Amino acid sequence: MPRVQFRLAGLIAICVATWPAPAEARLVVDRVVVRGATDVTTRVLAARMHLYSGDPVDFAILGAAEQRLIESDLFSSVRVFIDLPTDEAVRRMYLDENTYPVAVIVEAVGKHSWFVFPTASFGSGDWAGGVVYANQNLIGRDVQLISAGQIGQSRSYAFVGYRDPLVVGAPLTYSMSALYRREQIRLFENHGMVLQVPTIVAGGDCQIGWVLSPHTRAFLGLSARYQTVNPAEDLASGAIPLPYNSRSGRIFLLQFQFQYDDTRAQEGLRQGILLFLKNEVSDRYWASDFDYSKFETRVELYGHYWWNYPSLILKMVLNYPTSDHGVPVTEMLRIGGSALRGYLANEFHGDTLFSAQAEDQAVLLRLRLPWTQVRFNVAAAIFVDAATLLDRHPGGTTVPPPDTLPPPVRSKLDDIHASFGGGVRLILPGVVIPALKIDVGYGIDVRDVAVTVSIAGGGIM
């Protein structure tokens, strides 16, 4: 009996080894044909789809290519297919052993690629206004250009940035930007401004990244800026000057960044998950005039049930000096205003930040803009914000100023600032940033109300 079993097993093994393998896909890409109203070049489309001349084609590959184009956010509608009857396509893909070149057809309607819009914000003891130009498909090459300018009570700037989200022929991305900013660094005590420090920052940065998946990217970068710090002014009468790093000089940073983002906003209301990690290091070893390390992590969760869109944003930033040259005053952590509603703009400062923002938006109305086909949402929101920002290294260096008390090791109850309130949003479909946002928040520990109004986010930085 065992001998019969061995013979049967041997016959099965021989049959498996000699059985003809199923035919592989025999349709290959000949060219990409574009139909419809889009100015995206054929070369860019092929790179986005990961389909090049000579690559095999089947229904799974076509479906994956179409999904990649949808995720590019360049099209209002898109379809990827081959111009063959279904039965003929199946025969050539899976049954016929001959090779057939075929045209891959992309039928698409592109989104309007460029925008010019005003930005503004006022309330919480500050105001600013500016304009932004953004183009997410410059000359049809799937590269992005953004430029912005702002004039404000405490911050004015000019900014230009260029980004290639996916290099043709490689899973790479790169970006570069330049910035000029004048800012009054305000320091507060007991819900009132003590002094302000005039500063100027000019420079730029560049990054190169790896596109690990449609939602996942990792970056390495270099930032080079020069900071000028002028003498403090507007010292409040009878106030004791707060310590800060008054050093001017070069800020050279090595950067690492990781991001996972599968959020979407078809109606302008976000859904999905965003994970963000970033580490920046400045050191005199590479000719920087400052020594510090900054680590930031952020988690953003956006949901949807019925007509509600709840969200939760958790953030942690550690910004520690590594020598007596310390952290530049312009890189000091600050919070208040839109990031901690119910308080003055940038009311709190320090080097160890933990914050949370919980919000629920409910769509009340869906209306149409006059004389257009564009619809927008009117939403109401309720929110709770909380944050603690410790100053473990007063003055931003490892050498504490004279007569300074030792900083706390961990947060006490008095170090936690919380607020609650509500607001209204006007939201355009497909645009993540609300066109108009009004929030009224009550700061619990300061027992005060702050109103914040922003148009198009109030600016890009």
Spans of model-derived segments:
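Periplasmic polypeptide-binding modules associated with outer-membrane biogenesis and secretion
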Residues: 24-122, 132, 146-166, 202, ...
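Short acidic, glycine/proline-rich loop/turn micro-motifs
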Residues: 46, 187-190, 234, 393-397
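N-terminal signal peptide c-region/cleavage motif recognized by signal peptidases
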Residues: 18-22
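Conserved helix-loop functional segments at active or binding sites
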Residues: 260-267, 363-368
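C-terminal transmembrane beta-barrel domains of outer membrane proteins
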Residues: 49, 73, 273-461
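Sec-dependent signal peptide recognition
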Residues: 3-11
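Gram-negative/organellar outer-membrane beta-barrel architecture
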Residues: 79, 98-263, 273, 332-338, ...
